[in-house]
Amino acid sequence: CYDLVDGNLVLKGLINPDRSTDTVPYITGGIYTKYKRAFHGGRLEIKAQLGCATGAWPAIWLKPFEEAKYPWPSGGEIDIMEHLNYDSIAYQTVHSTYTHNLNIKKDPPQGSTGPIDPAGYNV
């Protein structure tokens, strides 16, 4: 579900060609760094072109390195970017025990949105 085109990694969603072993109707490409990379401060910069389609949900999430030790929601999750369908915005959200179990989402704000260029690259 991916191609390398002119030095760009292109992730795709495709109709599942073999539903005998996996019954989901569609399969998608993705990058999973679970147990491969941990970040301790600093800046993470990602350049991505976000296509639009019904049902599309490209996302970039940060989760705990030791997820078994810190399960969701206590370990938290930072949604760096989620783009839905044909929206001209991306969503940024923080999930945690504070926001999920205690339902405190406004002080401080749980998330925000920002404009994107659906036809171009976004950083």
Question: What do the PLM-derived regions correspond to, one by one?
Answer:
Residues C1-V123:
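GH16 jelly-roll
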